[in-house]
Amino acid sequence: MEPQEVAAAAGVHPIELCVYSILSNNLDGIYQSVNDLRESQALLVVRLKQIRNLLKEEQEYYNEEEGLGVERERLEELELRVEKLTQKYKKLLADCV
């Protein structure tokens, strides 16, 4: 069937049929582009979640290290105290003998 026959059978003017055909092709392209964007967006969201989780883990690691820093300082203070007490006991032992 010729386009004019199709247009006449449907009661549509040939120019309307051409305009519909052009718009239909553009709409299909737009629909495909929107679907591609949605897929890209979904992939980006997944990747952002992965990055966020990695950053959280790294932050927890650094926070833990800072907490260990306090414990290290306390341990160093205890080592100094033990060293001073050891020297004091050695001196007392030397004085007693």
UniProtKB/Swiss-Prot annotation:
Residues 45-97 form a coiled coil. Keywords: Coiled coil, Endosome, Transport. Disulfide bonds: none annotated. GO terms for cellular component: endosome. It is found in: Endosome. It comes from the Eukaryota. Transmembrane segments: none annotated. Component of the biogenesis of lysosome-related organelles complex-1 (BLOC-1), a complex involved in endosomal cargo sorting. Component of the biogenesis of lysosome-related organelles complex-1 (BLOC-1). Belongs to the SNAPIN family. This is Biogenesis of lysosome-related organelles complex 1 subunit SNN1. It comes from Lachancea thermotolerans (strain ATCC 56472 / CBS 6340 / NRRL Y-8284) (Yeast). The gene is SNN1.
